[in-house]
């Protein structure tokens, strides 16, 4: 299915989207009313200026009887009215900007709050670049297009009715010439707007894909270059870029036809007014000043039709972007907490009872998993890639909910406690390090913002990060780049370990926590971990089996099941799957 067909909104969907937009604007009704009032003042002032100009012309066309005093008074009046119109335009801009930026801020805040309530499955299945595009580019287009377009639409309608009333007062037949020809521009604009709307929707969708691809390429540039995939990456980007160019050119082609097409209609109107008005002036039906007023009004009457047609196109694009933003806001939240969810009081006792889980309905990953972890035990989880090790960690943290069975901490089902208290009970160090853009100190104190400097330094020393931090240009005040590019992967992992060392929650999750650290530092870190894990229930996911010899219990997982269980020596003695895994990692060393 094409992007255009897939994203096309029905009239009912457009109506619903527009109603939601108006709901977002409602908190700023005072600014909206002010905007409409000053727009009306601006239109009235602009409509009054042609009358003054016409009067001035008539006062200068008498037979040797030019009223200079009258012309001067009119000139002063024109200056005053023009100043009022300019002031009104400035106030209109102030009000519109306030509404636009306020609504943009509110929407982005709402979108970020939404992301924090979305299930991990949504974030795993949607490119981060597309989500960023919805929060940034689509919100900007939506706010600018709808709010500014609405004001232009209102001003245009006022101008149309205002000029129509003034023209009818002056001369009905000439007015009919204007009224009969001008609607042609609406017919043309409506046809072009329908054609361009679908392309604007496709443009927004493809732009999201492009942002996601660029984000992916930038984050993985080292891997791309290491594997020599520059050409393939460029080809993929060129394909998406070509799609964006194609839909953008089609959208711009039809929207750009609007202005010349409506201007052609305007020229016909202007010529018709000039011809009919000249005939009336020759016969004495109107004065030259009145003809001048009519020509000016004819131009002002047709101008809003040009603007309205352009605004309609802009509104179509804005509605398409608004629909994408609301699609994000309407995404299904993670399973809500129970009404009486209590704060978890963990004692370290963790039970998994007949747990089953699958990411896809037809692909079971974990089936019938049961486990009883006593307080203070160190549980190592090993197995081949894809056996469910990290998935089990996600279930313990309730990033995903089990499909069946239950997970209990301190005898309480984790679905009956608050997520914040559950996740706050674990200290987590992952293989994939994440640091925020900020100072080293801020990153270490991420889980405890009120930590003193002494506490931060103590945590860094415990994680063996203090020595390298001291060598940084600003020490603990060194700013880490957004992607952590100014420190090594191992240093990033040390900071993540220090972050957990500072908080020391009652339970720990270490997912290959020392994978990016050199062997010498790893030995020291393992000793620090050993002290930290004393008395704390700890889950250790490891690929290097040499790191989990001291675990109280080693769970060997295969195809979502625990196939072996015991300590290191027991499992080696059994000569089963664990023994094969362990020996395979040391075959190269022994040979």
Language-model features: locations:
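ABC-type nucleotide-binding domain
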Residues: 337, 343-591
